[in-house]
Amino acid sequence: MAKGIKHKSTTILDRLNALWALLTISDSDFNAYMGSYDELFSASPENTKEDYENGVPLKGYSQGSSSELQELYKVMHLLCTLGSVEKMYMPPEIDSEQSVLQNQILFEQIVAKDLKLNAGEKVLELGCGCGAIAEHIASLTGAIPYGMNLDESQIEKSWKNPNLSIPNFTVGDFNKPLEFDDNFFDAIYAIQPLTYVSDHAFTFKEVFRVLKPGGMFVINDVAALDTYDSKNEHQKTLIQHTRELTVFGGFWYYKYWEDSFIEAGFTLISSKGRPAVEMIKKEVSLFDKYEALFRFLSKIHLIPKKTNALMSRMNENSQSYIQAEEEELLTLNWHCVGQKPERL
């Protein structure tokens, strides 16, 4: 893929297609989505700062390969496409005056620099969604994009993008052996999918295996911060509400992410968290309007009750997300950069 291709935002047609899919959703897909919350987000694993300091081992997310997760994302992607987060992640605040999409673009420019790619080199995105981030990273670097994602519907959407090579984007699971040769990729990255890792040591070792010596591994994901106390019921409730709104799995103190890099053999280059409060407020405001509109249209029988129920469930307790970040309990954007040593 050549450099310089203009970054594309979510189009009106994208949103109309997503809306139509939500309006015509089958009973089976509706019931699977609504039931997935109890299956996926009850008693999800946590490791806090206190756990880390007491040497408590990291506990992975056991349902990271489950059919329930696939059913959740089949619908969640459609809901997110109505807003600014078709890429399925909330960006950190790079410029609080800019839109959510513009901050995604600015953050992806940072990631592209971290990856240190040259034109023609191969880069893999774990949890690539429909390939929108991969397309942008490739346009910035001239690298050849690859992607894998658990949700087949999003991979099928990536195949319709003329800027992405169909064979390079596959249904895949980072909780299983990666189907690539040793030392295959020049760089690998993951933006907010890794809370579904079942075994950090396994997944990070697999990334290490398929990465070339000197290659960069960049992640940006959810992390518990110093302030979070799992014994504080108020804080615990805010985190649970945020988990259900943003559909993250495991919740781990940021030092566990750092150790996962080091224990797999990477040199940890940098590790930092960024807030996203202003971005969150923008998106919550938008989805509050959607929720009010859907409720009204459902009441006068212009849209199915199922469609209204989907929006209401997704947007439930959205203010808790804002509060959790303002109280510095978590960030959805803990950003680590690691490098595989040139010589092993």
Functional labels for PLM-detected ranges:
Residues 223-249:
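Short, glycine-/aromatic-enriched active-site segment of Class I SAM-dependent methyltransferases
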